[in-house]
């Protein structure tokens, strides 16, 4: 029976999302202007942040771009922020946007090499605990020199490869043309294997995700806010590494111990092993690939290997913006592996562009946070504390809590600017400023693993094409990150409270780093 035009509009709104979800979004859109104009803009701002987090939490029901985008458009329309402020945020974060557009697409053209390497690792290491540690350590090591988003893009690319290989065989379809998002053709016997395999991949991805945070906090190139903090403090690569080490080294080792423990104890959704049937399929696939590999395929692997070397060197030496290095990877990889048709290249951009659009919406929410000064009460309260040791601990905690809610790049930037202003005005000494910069950097990087909105890499993982395939939801990510959140946050706080000041003093005595005088760079304007 045909439906009326009115019902058709309702049915089309947010498509297949549940009715209660559609009602919730419409309710948000009605409530926000009322709260903004009639009650309090500050309250309306926090309400908007909570609603946006809700859309992220429901990412498996509906991609957050549409509901989050509607909320952002309304916020701009009613004057919670301005298009100019949103543009300012996007311009300030152009490197992150370029990275998503080009680097993730560049990784797509290297997936044969990545699948080749990681298949060897996956099949070579039988112990799940050792395998988890390998993934966590590799992600941490790479994130210290590359960007965490790049590392996660690599891991996602590999995991989709592994998943689709098994799914094809389990569905009885030929390797060539197959839709790995449909489970209809899978028998009950293999369905159990599939569920176990999903749990196995989920745990590896979460270990790798936390690994990016463990490594990303240690160096000035690991996360975008690290660069901003290092720039404001006038630190170079070596000094940044040394100043962070009293906090980052204990955290790193405790993170690896946590990784091993959750696997051994099989808690928080960890501990799933690779099912034997799946292992056999991957072994058979690897053997088949080896037999059918032509010289042309070998040449492609060599080219991709050389491009991988170029990628690591270029990123470690900061030869260009990350996104531009990604563009060079696309050009080199396609030129030397013979991918020259436009439609073949288009597939590479499918994964990252929806997320790039979502991130643009995210930055418009950040613009609201800036214009409505949502974090100001917290910042003022912490700066008002007289005792230096308490101030350090509070800065770490406040940064950590706000980074769980908002983007850690934004939180780190806002805080370092406020502290820089306090230094210029003579409210704190240069020595205290350097210690606070460490507290801000570690505070934004470590506790923010608690939720996907804190870390861009986690958000990318949650909204990737892989998340629904392996049933990785917002809630599940929060639960799986919980043991890491507790350990990283507490060990980081202990480092700030007990190790940072004495260790920094001993670094000065040893001559590894020198105390800075009042030399300053100008404060970054706006939010970033």
Swiss-Prot record:
Na(+)/H(+) antiporter that extrudes sodium in exchange for external protons. The chain crosses the membrane at residues 24-46, 96-118, 130-163, 240-262, 298-317, 321-340, 353-375, 390-412, 478-500. The gene is nhaB. The keyword Cytoplasm does not apply. Coiled coil: none annotated. It comes from the Bacteria. It comes from Vibrio alginolyticus. Residues 1-23, 119-129, 263-297, 341-352, 413-477 are cytoplasmic. This is Na(+)/H(+) antiporter NhaB.
């Amino acid at each position: 029976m045909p439906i009326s035009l009115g019902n058709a509009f309702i049915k089309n709104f947010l498509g297949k999302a549940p009715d209660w979800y559609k009602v919730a979004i419409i309710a948000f859109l009605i409530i926000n202007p009322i709260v903004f104009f009639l009650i309090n803009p500050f309250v309306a701002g926090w309400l908007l942040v909570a609603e946006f987090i809700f859309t992220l939490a429901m990412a498996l029901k509906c991609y957050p771009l549409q509901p989050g985008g509607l909320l952002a458009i309304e916020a701009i329309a009613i004057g919670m922020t301005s298009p100019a402020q949103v543009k300012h945020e996007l311009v300030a974060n152009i490197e992150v946007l370029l990275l998503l557009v080009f680097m993730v697409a560049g990784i797509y053209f290297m997936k044969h090499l990545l699948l080749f390497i990681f298949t060897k690792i996956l099949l070579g290491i039988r112990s799940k605990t050792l395998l988890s540690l390998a993934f966590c350590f590799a992600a941490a090591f790479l994130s210290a020199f590359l960007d965490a988003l790049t590392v996660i893009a690599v891991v996602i690319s590999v995991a989709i490869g592994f998943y689709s290989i098994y799914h094809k065989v389990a569905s009885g379809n030929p390797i060539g043309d197959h839709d790995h998002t449909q489970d209809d053709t899978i028998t009950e016997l293999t369905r159990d294997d599939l569920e176990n395999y999903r749990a196995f991949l989920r745990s590896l991805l979460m270990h790798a995700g936390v690994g990016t945070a463990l490594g990303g906090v240690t160096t000035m190139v690991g996360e975008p806010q690290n660069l901003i903090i290092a720039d404001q403090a006038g630190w170079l690569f070596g000094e940044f590494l040394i100043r962070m080490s009293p906090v980052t080294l204990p955290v790193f080792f405790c993170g690896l111990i946590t990784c091993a423990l959750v696997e051994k104890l099989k808690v928080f959704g960890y501990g799933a092993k690779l099912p034997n049937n799946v292992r056999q399929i991957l072994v058979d696939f690897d053997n088949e690939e080896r037999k059918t590999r032509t010289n042309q395929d070998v040449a492609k692997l060599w080219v991709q290997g050389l491009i991988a070397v170029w990628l690591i060197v270029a990123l470690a030496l900061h030869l260009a913006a990350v996104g531009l290095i990604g563009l060079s990877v696309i050009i080199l990889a396609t030129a030397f592996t013979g991918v020259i048709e436009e439609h073949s290249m288009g597939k590479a951009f499918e994964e990252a562009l929806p997320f790039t659009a979502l991130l643009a919406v995210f930055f418009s929410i950040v613009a609201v946070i800036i214009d409505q000064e949502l974090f100001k009460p917290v910042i003022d309260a912490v700066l008002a504390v007289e005792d230096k040791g308490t101030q350090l601990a509070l800065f770490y905690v406040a940064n950590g809590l706000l980074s769980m809610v908002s983007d850690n790049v934004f939180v780190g930037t806002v805080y370092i600017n406020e502290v820089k202003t306090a230094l210029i005005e003579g409210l704190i000494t240069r020595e205290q400023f350097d210690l606070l910069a460490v507290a801000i950097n570690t505070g934004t990087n470590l506790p923010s693993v608690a939720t996907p909105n804190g870390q861009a890499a986690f958000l990318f993982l949650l909204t990737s094409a892989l998340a629904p395939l392996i049933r990785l939801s917002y809630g599940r990510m929060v639960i799986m990150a919980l043991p890491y959140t507790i350990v990283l946050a507490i060990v980081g706080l202990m480092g700030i409270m007990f190790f940072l000041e004495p260790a920094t003093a001993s670094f000065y005595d040893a001559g590894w780093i020198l105390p800075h005088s009042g030399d300053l760079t100008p404060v970054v304007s706006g939010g970033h």
